[in-house]
């Protein structure tokens, strides 16, 4: 059963008129409210420059407030919206903040709040993070009570800009008060990694170079950058999802056992393993950019008028990693991510070494697949006797498909889970400053090389293909053994994202 906490919390969403707020932040707050994890006494204030009324904002977000199955619950939606108001004001001058201060203080006085609990959510472009944080600190910070600030990615563009950003933020808010959101850390299967790895003797025992042949973290999206090309052109797939989301996944997958679930113990281990990553070898990558689909119905990346006509922006990358520690030394690790591919999925593939020959001549490797999305699942491809008289092997699976096993469970959306953590002050699933520093140190030399004058030309791959040419060979070179065509059959069709 849901627990209630802190009454009369004030949540202010900066950038409330924007896309992220509408699609993620408000729906997440609604989800928490619907499930009983947001106290009905909470006051939610949207703040942005656009001149909107309370009703305008409510109407804007209303279509996105749904139950997990997509159904509407008008009564709950209306209750929730009655907690929401809007205030228009600038980001870079005091006037709007002073008005906001008055609104918040009036609410807290009326409710007789001694120790304010204020959460500020910055759903804003990074160019104004610092302005807003400075104004917040000046005008809305109280010495007593709790103030927390959630900031959205990107946290910098490279090591230097991330360091500068951090140097400006640090004097304003302490690490305890800052919550750098990486929404992948709020996904159910990502949160499951620690428990699965360290809560199962058999997995824990096999999680090392003696047993594991290769590791892959895979991100595929079936759509391109349509409409976001201008933004994406200076970002590319490596900054967009690899340096942050996928590296977080890889870190949780490869770190040592923390002493407890305590946030700092977990984050200490993450930083430690990141420091053991070898520098990325510029020759150990495969990069691509999507062209038109084979039938010509889908545009190429360069067809987007908002991108440079000779852009070398990378929309697909496969990167080989090495971790120089006792557990992982010599195990090839591949992170691959691409837009405009044949399907949408995010998964982890751990392929185990072959069993000794002799008894067997040609028996497939075990493979553990953790599907983060869509349709969360964990399956272990293993070998078993085909039922019947013959003594033949068949590759089958130990299967945990969440929609089957956990039919009646509410699986929170990433933002629901993370906003709740921030309200409770739990930093476990947020990015710490030193983590950010090490991750940028790892990726910046590669980005400088790719974006520098001698940077290679990405291979063009057709929109909608499974992977760019060369990926099969790249994976094979990194220890991945492909199953023989037709040797493994899954009886159920996996829903497409
Ligand atoms: P697949 O056979 O789809 O893929 C295995 C791996 O080989 C993937 O990494 C895939 O890459 C790669 N690969 C294969 N052929 C190529 C190629 N031509 N080019 C590039 N890469 C290639 O997955 P599984 O064997 O794990 O499972 C088979 C099917 O069964 C899947 O649809 C899976 O979802 C389903 N299944 C579902 C379960 C569940 O829902 N609980 C349980 C077990 C199986 P890429 O990913 O890029 O295609
Ligand atoms: C965002 C990226 O951070 O993550 C997007 O900017 C990407 O380009 C998205 O599509 C993927 O998130 P999810 O939760 O849809 O897998």
Curated annotation (Swiss-Prot):
Record field: catalytic activity: D-glucose 6-phosphate + NADP(+) = 6-phospho-D-glucono-1,5-lactone + NADPH + H(+)
Record-stated family: Belongs to the glucose-6-phosphate dehydrogenase family.
Keyword list, A-Z: Carbohydrate metabolism, Glucose metabolism, NADP, Oxidoreductase
Name this polypeptide is given: Glucose-6-phosphate 1-dehydrogenase
Gene from which this protein is expressed: ZWF
PANTHER family per UniProt: GLUCOSE-6-PHOSPHATE 1-DEHYDROGENASE (PTHR23429:SF0), GLUCOSE-6-PHOSPHATE 1-DEHYDROGENASE G6PD (PTHR23429)
This protein's GO CC annotations: cytosol
Organism: Kluyveromyces lactis (strain ATCC 8585 / CBS 2359 / DSM 70799 / NBRC 1267 / NRRL Y-1140 / WM37) (Yeast)
InterPro entries reported in the protein's UniProt record: G6P_DH (IPR001282), G6P_DH_AS (IPR019796), G6P_DH_C (IPR022675), G6P_DH_NAD-bd (IPR022674), NAD(P)-bd_dom_sf (IPR036291)
């Amino acid at each position: 059963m849901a627990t209630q906490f802190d009454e009369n919390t004030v949540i202010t969403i900066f950038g409330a008129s924007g896309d992220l707020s509408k699609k993620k932040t408000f729906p997440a707050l609604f989800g928490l409210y619907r499930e009983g994890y947001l106290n009905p006494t909470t006051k939610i204030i949207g703040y942005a420059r656009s001149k909107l009324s309370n009703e305008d904002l409510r109407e804007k977000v209303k279509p996105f407030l749904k139950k997990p199955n997509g159904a509407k619950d008008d009564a709950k939606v209306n209750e929730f919206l009655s907690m929401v108001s809007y205030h228009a004001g600038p980001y870079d001058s005091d006037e709007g903040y002073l008005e906001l201060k008055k609104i918040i203080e009036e609410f807290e006085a009326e409710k007789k709040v001694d120790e304010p609990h204020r959460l500020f959510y910055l759903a804003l472009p990074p160019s104004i993070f610092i302005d807003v944080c400075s104004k917040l600190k000046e005008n809305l910070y109280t010495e007593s009570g709790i103030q927390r600030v959630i900031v959205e990615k990107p946290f910098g563009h490279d090591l230097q800009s991330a360091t500068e950003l951090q140097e400006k933020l640090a004097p304003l808010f302490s690490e305890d008060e800052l919550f750098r959101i990486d929404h992948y850390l709020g996904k159910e299967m990502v949160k499951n990694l620690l428990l699965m790895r360290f809560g199962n003797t058999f997995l824990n025992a096999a999680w090392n170079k003696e047993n594991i042949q290769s590791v892959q973290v895979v991100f595929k999206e079936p759509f391109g950058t349509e409409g976001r090309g201008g933004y994406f052109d200076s970002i590319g797939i490596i900054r967009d999802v690899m340096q942050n989301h996928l590296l977080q996944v890889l870190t949780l997958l490869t770190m040592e056992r923390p002493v407890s679930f305590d946030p700092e113990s977990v984050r200490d281990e993450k930083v430690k393993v990141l420091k053991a990553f070898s520098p990325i070898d510029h020759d150990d990558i495969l990069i691509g950019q999507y062209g038109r689909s084979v039938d010509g119905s889908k545009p190429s990346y360069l067809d987007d008028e908002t991108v440079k006509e000779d852009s070398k922006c990378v929309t697909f990358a496969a990167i080989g990693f090495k971790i120089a520690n006792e557990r992982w030394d010599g195990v090839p690790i591949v992170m691959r991510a691409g837009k405009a591919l044949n399907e949408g999925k995010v998964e982890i593939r751990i392929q185990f070494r072959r069993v000794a020959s002799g008894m067997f001549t040609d028996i497939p490797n075990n493979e553990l697949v953790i599907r983060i999305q869509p349709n969360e699942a964990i399956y272990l491809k293993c070998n078993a006797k085909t039922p019947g008289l013959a003594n033949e092997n068949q590759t089958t699976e130990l299967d945990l498909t969440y929609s089957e096993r956990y039919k009646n469970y509410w699986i929170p959306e990433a933002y629901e889970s993370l906003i709740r953590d921030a309200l409770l002050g739990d930093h476990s699933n947020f990015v710490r400053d030193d983590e950010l520093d090490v991750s940028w140190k790892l990726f910046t030399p590669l980005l400088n090389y790719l974006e520098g004058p001698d940077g290679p030309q990405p291979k063009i791959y057709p929109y909608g293909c499974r992977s760019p040419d060369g990926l099969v060979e790249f994976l094979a070179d990194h220890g991945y053994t492909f199953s023989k065509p037709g040797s493994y059959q899954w009886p159920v069709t996996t829903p497409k994202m």
